[in-house]
Amino acid sequence: MNLGKQLTLPAVAVVASVVLLGCERPPPEVVQKGYRGVAMEQNYNPRLLEASIKANLPVESLPAAAPGGPSVSDVYENVQVLKDLSVAEFTRTMVAVTTWVAPKEGCNYCHVPGNWASDDIYTKVVSRRMFELVRATNSNWKDHVAETGVTCYTCHRGNPVPKYVWVTDPGPNQPSGVTPTGQNYASSTVAYSALPLDPYTPFLDQSNEIRVIGQTALPAGNTTSLKQAEWTYGLMMQISDSLGVNCTFCHNSRSFYDWKQSTPQRTTAWYAIRHVRDINQNYIWPLNDALPASRKGPYGDPFKVGCMTCHQGAYKPLYGAQMAKDYPALYESAPAEAAPATEEAPAAEAEAVEAAPVEEAAPAPVEQAAAPVEDAAPAPQQL
């Protein structure tokens, strides 16, 4: 009998230790984000938040270029995108981009040695299109990026290929005849949940419907399947993990679907999803033929972007550091006649400005990071 107890206690201790490995080490802290007692809150762990801030520090901007001087088009050949710059500003921009994208490889990562005008290197073709992407983002997608904007560093962080890109995942091989349809793999793409492991392809590459919640008490008229709902929740887990926030950063706890009760950040997220689709479909996919196999997935699709590509665990990329404003080359020289987004946000969201039951968020619980919720994404009336 005593022997049984001696064996049982260590076994219980081992099981308990394994279970606790899945828990986050305390102390978590809670920031109220709405009415009291209704779970409108953001949860932060000061230790993890401090690490996130260190990982999302911006780099210093280069000194401003001297005004005036010859146009880059008069000096260099085959400048197609940045031709409206002076030579001084063009050179400054090239130096900055090199430090943001290929600090080890240098200029020859994108240029043929001895012939900078040549297009006989795929990275130059890609980088030219990426300049167009950044300029279009900063000039035409203010509903998403507001005045903060983006730079090459927002995604690349000193790497030729951004750390957080994705391709369509075929999933692990299945020896049995029953396939789990991408579920129960504890994948990082869905924050290690049991949800389908590829929330990207249907929603951030394709334009499948994300909403699955019925708007009536009975399910009449809502033909959404359980599988579709699980895919949607997989996307929500990915967004939450990418931004380092709870569901209530965008949604109201009592009614996730209702735009009138949602927070202003949901409007920004609506535009963000469409912005990501625009990037993947109109900027990345057209480059697929120019890319080598090392820049593609098992199905031959190119490395694409998702929320994590820019945000990297921060509710705003680089916690809202405004790097783009120091580089005029990263904006289109003249405003576009129409933004690339052809859709309008749901009509009810306009009412969410006054109706959303949320208060101005309190400062985050870590002194160095007073911003994670306080400096929230722009409210709908600013979009």
Swiss-Prot record:
Signal peptide per UniProt: 1-22
S-diacylglycerol cysteine lipid modification positions: 23
Binding site for heme 3: 236, 247, 250-251
Keyword line: Electron transport, Heme, Iron, Lipoprotein, Membrane, Metal-binding, Palmitate, Photosynthesis, Reaction center, Repeat, Signal, Transport
UniProt GO MF annotations: electron transfer activity; heme binding; iron ion binding
Main location: membrane
Single GO BP term: photosynthesis, light reaction
The organism's place on the tree of life at top rank: Bacteria
Lipidation (N-palmitoyl cysteine): 23
Gene3D superfamilies the UniProt entry points to: Photosynthetic Reaction Center, subunit C, domain 2 (1.10.468.10)
Subunit structure: Component of the photosynthetic reaction center composed of protein subunits L (PufL), M (PufM), H (PuhA) and cytochrome C (PufC). The reaction center interacts with light-harvesting antenna complex LH1.
Role according to the record: The reaction center of purple bacteria contains a tightly bound cytochrome molecule which re-reduces the photo oxidized primary electron donor.
Protein name, UniProt field: Photosynthetic reaction center cytochrome c subunit
Gene it is expressed from: pufC
